[in-house]
Swiss-Prot record:
Glycosylation sites: 408, 431, 459, 609, 635
UniProt-recorded name of the protein: Probable glucan endo-1,3-beta-glucosidase btgC
Feature: compositional bias, Low complexity: 341-360
Origin species: Neosartorya fischeri (strain ATCC 1020 / DSM 3700 / CBS 544.65 / FGSC A1164 / JCM 1740 / NRRL 181 / WB 181) (Aspergillus fischerianus)
UniProt record similarity statement: Belongs to the glycosyl hydrolase 17 family.
Gene3D superfamilies assigned to the protein according to its UniProt record, in alphabetical order: Glycosidases
Comp. bias (Polar residues): 175-188
Compartments where located: Cell membrane
Extracellular face residues: 329-689
Length: 689
């Protein structure tokens, strides 16, 4: 899942295969035998009404007019090489900046403690909600970008966090229209269809955060700050075209850093080195923009603003210091903190660090009482071909100060092994892959496989660090048969905005580099990337060994009784059709449904009533699983479920009417199955890999 306002179009892709005039229903061809949907009424994707044509397809007349706003020029911002989202604490602003975030943490995360309470408080983007709420890599982070343009078809107002635009794709208060309405399948990350929504923008499925504030009192020159672009302190731009401005205010308290930013309009992958100094509204900069840029000079009257900033900074340090003070001991985000006594031990202490956990409980294994309890849940069934997973606390560089807990990963894997034999990761930072491998070894799981993940960022340093770590993991592995393949980038093209072509070239180069390394080491593993279903085209299909598409019916505003059919047909029309005549495998790399938080009518929480569109809830989640899981299992439809565990820290991305960001898990953060939720047992049939 990626950033906000992710929409699904029924128009053509780059190669035209999905155009109404040329696209055929794959469902009526060789794909009839893989539909996970039983016969029934076919739904009309445009009006949500069923017809008597079965559940097969979506009408071909999907093109609609798309509303567009004024077109200010995008700015080239600075891309951070820090793991998206979790390395930044909020908008740099007086009053409403660090201090505001600090108070928000104290008020909204009262159940959590220390750094755990800080997780996800990477900032606010006025009026724009985060998609999945992932501001970090992988399924644990909503990679939240600025939303795409406003449109009147199936839209996911919120891109699922793990996959959204990189930090700061938007200059606040502006809307930009870069793409022709004749190609609605392309996402525009610069429009703001949520005016007045008061939402948060970050970015997921992963997934980057953008921040803005309505009254930031001072301009800060980042050239005066020592910053190598890889520490999570990301400067934000000053936009003269908007009353709203963003500042970067680096601060530290007890090892925690706060930095407000509007990241990198200037480059998803093709960023220049940190030495480059290009900044400003440069049309078409996109992927080719520099990673660092000069700021405009402060406006007259900056003296009073500076005094206001100093006062605000002092207050901010006091408040942040008080909050983070409780984390100085190294408190980590520990799912075990809220575990029931039946499935926990003394490791559940809310004040334990990773080191404390290991000292108290040792290196947990299959014989540990806590693990035995976790692995004996009769309500869990191994019916999912794959599950998206990001371990708790693997956000770089915060993990250098507060390392994630190996025992927490082992606990997670003890649960996941009862749901699937196939886990997908989103990145390589903070030893997350190594910890998963260690957990599998300690639990003596023989049939678990891993899809390696590599987070591709706008900052070359980040991407290089991730890829180099992938090579180390592969080269150090005693047996590479545990790996199913490597996924290089998640929704990278979606986050590229109008620079999709340039981004695709860079992404393909990264994929080819990984392929070459595998070949050199005589490693036979597929290399793929994952992106929105309608961001795939023939060129990308040719470069990837597997076509992996993220498809979320909830953000399409699809009523749950039609969601399974819509998901399958969308995938067939936009992805499976592209592989015709090839031996390419197709996988739905993300699909799921939130257990609460409101309803989405395709363009956010703008529904006429609380029962319209896609409604989040346990009953609806049960219905979607009932219609999808066993049928997909029976017919061999390959997919990854998003996701196993709730992510409470993502509550910061919720808005008044969109409160689903932290509710995508089958289980809560303490690994308890949600009340009323029923995972289908599919008559005893289990997923095998």
């Amino acid at each position: 899942m990626s950033g906000p306002n992710r929409t699904y179009s029924f128009g053509e892709g780059d190669d035209g295969l999905a155009h109404p005039s040329s696209r055929t229903h794959a469902m009526h061809s060789q794909y009839d035998d893989v539909s996970p949907i039983s016969d029934g009424a076919r739904m009309n994707p445009m009006n949500g009404q069923g017809t008597d044509h079965g559940l097969a397809s979506v009408p071909e007349d999907g093109h609609q007019g798309w509303g567009r706003g004024p077109e200010p020029s995008p700015s080239i911002l600075t891309g951070s090489s820090a793991t998206p989202g979790m390395d930044n604490l909020g908008p740099g602003a007086v009053g409403g900046g660090i201090s505001g975030i600090a108070l928000s943490v104290a008020n909204s995360h009262d159940r959590l403690s220390g750094v755990e309470a800080l997780m996800g408080t990477d900032g606010q983007e006025a009026n724009i909600p985060a998609e999945r709420g992932f501001s970090t890599t992988g399924s644990d982070n909503p990679y939240v970008p600025a939303p795409p343009e406003h449109r009147y078809s199936y839209g996911s107002n919120i891109a699922l966090g793990a996959a959204a635009a990189p930090a700061g794709q938007l200059t606040p208060g502006q809307s930009v229209s870069h793409l022709s309405s004749s190609n609605p399948s392309q996402r525009n990350l610069y429009d703001i269809p949520y005016q007045g929504a008061g939402g948060l923008n970050a970015g997921p499925y992963q997934r980057h955060s953008a921040y803005s504030s309505n009254d930031l009192p001072v301009d800060i020159n980042p050239d005066e700050i020592v910053d190598d672009g890889d520490d999570g302190f990301v400067p934000a731009p000053n936009s003269s075209s908007s009353a709203r401005k963003s500042q970067a205010i680096p601060a530290a308290a007890g090892g925690a850093a706060a930095g407000g930013f509007l990241g990198n309009l200037g480059g998803l992958f093709g960023g220049k080195s940190a030495a480059d100094t290009s900044y400003g509204p440069v049309p078409g900069a996109g992927l080719e923009a520099g990673e660092k840029g000069r700021w405009v000079k402060p406006k007259p009257g900056g003296g009073s603003k500076k005094r206001g900033w100093i006062v605000g900074a002092i207050l901010a340090f006091i408040i942040i210091g008080a909050i983070v003070g409780g984390a100085v001991g190294g408190t980590i985000g520990h799912r075990g903190n809220e575990e029931p006594s039946s499935a926990s031990s003394s490791s559940s202490s809310s004040t334990q660090t990773a080191t404390d956990d290991t000292s108290t409980n040792g290196d947990l294994d299959k014989n540990s009482a806590e693990i035995k309890a976790l692995m004996n849940n009769k309500n869990l069934h191994k019916v999912f071909p794959g599950i998206d997973y990001t371990p708790w606390g693997v956000q770089y560089p915060l993990c250098l100060k507060y390392p994630p807990s190996q025992n927490n990963v082992t606990r997670d894997m003890a649960v996941l092994t009862q749901l699937t034999n196939n886990v997908r990761l989103y990145g390589t930072d903070c030893n997350q892959t190594e910890m998963v491998l260690h957990a599998i070894d300690k639990l003596e799981i023989k049939d678990m496989k891993i899809w390696l993940g590599v987070w591709i960022d706008s900052n070359i340093t980040t991407s290089r660090r991730q890829i180099d770590q992938l090579y180390k993991i592969i080269d150090d592995a005693k047996d590479t048969s545990i790996f199913n393949g490597a996924i290089v980038g998640n929704e990278a093209l979606y986050r590229a905005g109008s620079d999709k072509t340039s981004a695709q070239t860079t992404l393909i180069n990264y994929m080819q580099e990984v392929k070459d390394h595998f070949k050199k080491k005589n490693i036979d593993l597929p290399v793929a990337t994952s992106d929105l279903g309608d961001n795939w085209d023939a060129t990308l299909v040719q470069a990837a060994d597997v076509v992996m598409a993220n498809v979320h019916p909830f953000f399409g505003g699809i009523p749950v009784d039609q969601a399974a059919a819509w998901t399958w047909q969308f995938w067939q029309d936009h992805n499976v059709a592209l592989t015709k005549g090839t031996n390419k495998k197709q996988v739905i790399s993300e699909v799921g449904w939130p257990s609460g938080g409101g309803n989405d009518c395709g363009l956010g929480a703008n529904c006429p009533n609380d029962t319209a569109g896609a409604v989040a809830g346990v009953d609806e989640l049960n219905k979607f699983m009932e219609d999808w899981v066993c049928q997909a299992l029976e017919n061999g439809t390959d997919y990854f479920w998003f996701e196993a565990f709730d992510e409470p820290w993502k509550i910061v991305y919720n808005t008044a009417n969109e409160n689903w960001e932290d509710k995508w898990g089958l289980m809560d953060a303490a690994r308890n199955l949600k009340p009323g939720l029923k995972i289908p047992d599919c008559g005893g049939k289990t997923a095998t890999r």
